């Protein structure tokens, strides 16, 4: 059982929902990332999605695009991101880390070298936004051999046939994108999400995490009621942007944002 599967299984047994925050590695500065990861855990994170900065993040809205720009300006590379995870692992052997990014940096490193480096660093899962599961044949065995969970995205428009195909190629959890469009856009329709997630659950045994549109404790609780976990990204990255010159204020602001979400999710426990 992978670290991700273990955490999600334990939460399910407790009747609790996963809180999965996203930050971009290297933003606001590479030296800050490991400390921010620990802050997320202290504030209640169960799993961390760590973004690998890329120059053309096409699925992301302006908030995360700017975070990628800030990180790349500081020279944050894929190998540096691996080093950050390795450093994080020295004092946190338990919290799963999922690398989230685009195919290009992985291809540039080489799939096998990437899988080796990820496993060595203590990475638990990989979500590659622009890698369709049917094209993942090259990486799937490399990930499986190293106990890395491949995580894939489901959209509101994903067909049943495709949901089943994605489920077959996935492990750990699947990431349901609640809104059509880029990250940070629009308002979430919880009733619509509830219907879609219930339908996804009919087609896959994997836990379903829901992201896009979760901005506060209220939306976290609403989405948590109908899913296995909530994924919070743009609002955290926006907070980082607003406090990028003051590390202490930044950590406090992230805690103030995330901790009420944790409490709201735990209030749903049964």
Curated annotation (Swiss-Prot):
**EC top class named in words:** lyase
Record has Transcription as a keyword: no
Q: What is its EC number?
A: 4.2.1.20
Query: A single GO CC term, please?
Result: cytosol
Q: Catalysed reaction per UniProt?
A: (1S,2R)-1-C-(indol-3-yl)glycerol 3-phosphate + L-serine = D-glyceraldehyde 3-phosphate + L-tryptophan + H2O
Q: In which pathway does it act?
A: Amino-acid biosynthesis; L-tryptophan biosynthesis; L-tryptophan from chorismate: step 5/5
The answer to keyword Lyase applying to this record is yes
- InterPro entries xref list: Aldolase_TIM, RibuloseP-bd_barrel, Trp_synthase_alpha_AS, Trp_synthase_suA
Q: Which GO terms describe its molecular function?
A: tryptophan synthase activity
A Pfam family (short name) is Trp_syntA
The record ties this protein, via NCBIfam families, to: trpA (TIGR00262)
Under which name does UniProt file this protein? Tryptophan synthase alpha chain
Read off the lineage from the record.
Bacteria, Pseudomonadati, Pseudomonadota, Gammaproteobacteria, Pseudomonadales
Chain's gene name: trpA
């Amino acid at each position: 059982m992978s670290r991700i599967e273990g955490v999600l299984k334990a939460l399910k047994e407790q009747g609790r929902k996963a809180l999965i925050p996203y930050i971009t590695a290297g933003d606001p500065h590479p030296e800050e990332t490991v400390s921010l990861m620990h802050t997320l855990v202290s504030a209640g994170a169960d799993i961390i999605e760590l973004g690998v900065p890329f120059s053309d993040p096409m699925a992301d809205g302006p908030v995360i695009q700017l975070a990628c720009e800030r990180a790349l300006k500081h020279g944050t590379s894929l190998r540096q991101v691996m080093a950050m995870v390795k450093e994080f692992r020295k004092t946190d052997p338990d919290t799963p880390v999922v690398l989230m990014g685009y195919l290009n940096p992985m291809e540039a490193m080489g799939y096998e070298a990437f899988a080796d480096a990820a496993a060595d660093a203590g990475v638990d899962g990989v979500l590659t936004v622009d890698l369709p599961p049917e094209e993942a044949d090259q990486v799937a065995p490399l990930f499986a051999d190293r106990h890395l969970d491949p995580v894939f995205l489901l959209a509101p428009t994903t067909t049943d046939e495709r949901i089943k195909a994605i489920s077959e190629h996935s492990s750990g959890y699947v990431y349901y994108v609640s809104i059509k469009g880029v990250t940070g856009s629009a308002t979430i329709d919880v009733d619509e999400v509830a219907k879609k997630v219930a339908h996804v659950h009919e087609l896959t045994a994997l836990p379903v995490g829901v992201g896009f549109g979760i901005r506060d404790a209220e939306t976290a609780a609403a989405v948590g009621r109908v899913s296995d976990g909530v994924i919070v990204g743009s609002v955290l990255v926006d907070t980082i942007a607003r406090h990028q010159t003051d590390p202490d204020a930044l950590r406090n602001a992230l805690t103030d944002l995330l901790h009420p979400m944790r409490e709201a999710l735990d209030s749903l426990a049964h």
